[in-house]
A protein has these predicted regions:
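Membrane-embedded alpha-helical bundles that constitute the cytochrome b-like, heme-associated redox core
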Residues: 1-180
Length: 180
């Protein structure tokens, strides 16, 4: 019951390793993205395995993070003096969802193109920030997929790592909350 945070971190490490391998062959352009994903799956040696591990680790990380947050919430482990750690954890959960969305779009097939339109449409409805977020990601197809690629491969993981370090430091300084 108390290993869900560690399991989430293990999935993240797997995602970083397999993501670096996939990034060597992926082409973030509207013309080459789908073909490069097909090439990774069929031509690159063990590409199907690397892509599969990345896919299942992403799903595992999302499930483990949600279960971890539910456990923290229902056991009351977010209470004083751990409120800031809870806020950081919610930020980590939000970034995990963002990483999943940006990774889904990188396949650049019909589903991904439709999903990015819906996702950016939802993002544009955020009061105050919506137009800024949408203007950053939306452009022509090459710009859009490039922005999602940079977000998925560089920005989101960098912020995730920084918040994880802070999250772990807070756990070390406050200790693990006692069970009910």
């Amino acid at each position: 019951m108390y290993c869900l945070g560690g399991l989430t971190f293990l999935f993240f490490v797997l995602l970083v390793i397999t993501g670096m391998m996939l990034a060597m062959y992926y082409k973030p352009s509207a013309a080459g993205a789908y073909d490069s994903v097909q090439e990774i799956s069929t031509v690159v040696r063990y590409g199907w395995l690397i892509r599969g591990v990345h896919f299942y680790a992403a799903n595992g990380m999302l499930i483990a993070a949600i279960l971890h947050m539910l456990r923290v919430y229902f056991t009351g482990a977010y209470k004083k003096p751990r409120e800031l750690n809870w806020v950081v954890g919610v930020g980590l959960g939000t970034l995990t969802l963002m990483a999943g969305f940006t990774g889904y779009v990188l396949r650049w097939d019909q589903e991904a193109v439709g999903a990015q339109g819906i996702g950016l449409g939802l993002a544009s409805s955020i009061p105050g920030l919506g137009t800024i977020v949408t203007s950053i990601f939306w452009g022509n197809y090459d710009e859009t997929i490039g922005h999602f690629f940079v977000g998925h491969v560089l920005l989101i993981p960098a912020v995730l790592i920084l918040l994880m370090v802070f999250h772990f430091w807070m756990i070390r300084s406050h200790g693990i909350a006692e069970p009910l």
